[in-house]
């Protein structure tokens, strides 16, 4: 018997978003054609990109794939756990994954009551983020207080895998060199 969390898209959410984006596109078209100086802002292209991003986020299989990739990359990382995806129960509109039994990192007093060292926790979050970015080139790009939890045994557990980052080998090397420059106070490297 396993406890799971289920994320379900609201009924008609795609239709609602598309109607809003249609209105935004019309506004972008009007502004860009009436105020010539706004052409350089490429408002129509911005709305088109927003539509593409929104359509991807409306398919929960993409979020599941991102969570699964992070899970595979970090399954041996001490102190960091990603919820497992249950693919047999996941679809375009439904995401099924392990339930998080933890405390949000915004609940400082509750964390302290479990003897969680807040400064160490902050350091650990940064180290995990950088490890994922530099080692794997794939990282959770939305690690705010609402998306990070801590289990009773001190593991950091992220949720919401809709916004992820990817770095190619060259950018990972560049990031590592910048970080090394900061650590060594070699600001020419930075």
Where are the predicted features?
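Conserved catalytic cores of large enzyme domains
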Residues: 1-190
């Amino acid at each position: 018997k396993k406890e799971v969390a289920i994320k379900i898209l609201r009924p008609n959410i795609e239709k609602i978003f598309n109607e809003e984006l249609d209105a935004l596109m019309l506004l972008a078209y009007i502004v860009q054609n009436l105020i010539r100086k706004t052409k350089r802002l490429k408002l129509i292209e911005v709305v088109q990109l927003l539509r593409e991003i929104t359509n991807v986020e409306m398919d929960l299989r993409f979020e599941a794939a991102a969570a699964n990739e992070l899970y595979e990359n970090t399954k041996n990382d001490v102190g960091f756990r990603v919820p497992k995806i249950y693919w047999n129960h996941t679809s375009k509109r439904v995401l099924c994954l392990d339930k998080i039994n933890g405390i949000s990192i915004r609940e400082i007093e509750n964390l302290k009551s479990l003897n969680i060292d807040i400064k160490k926790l902050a350091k650990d979050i940064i180290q995990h983020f950088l490890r994922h970015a530099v080692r794997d080139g794939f990282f959770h790009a939305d690690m705010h207080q609402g998306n990070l939890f801590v289990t009773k045994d001190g593991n950091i557990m992220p949720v919401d895998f809709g916004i992820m980052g990817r770095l190619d080998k060259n950018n990972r090397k560049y990031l590592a060199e910048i970080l090394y420059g900061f650590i060594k106070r070699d600001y020419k490297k930075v």
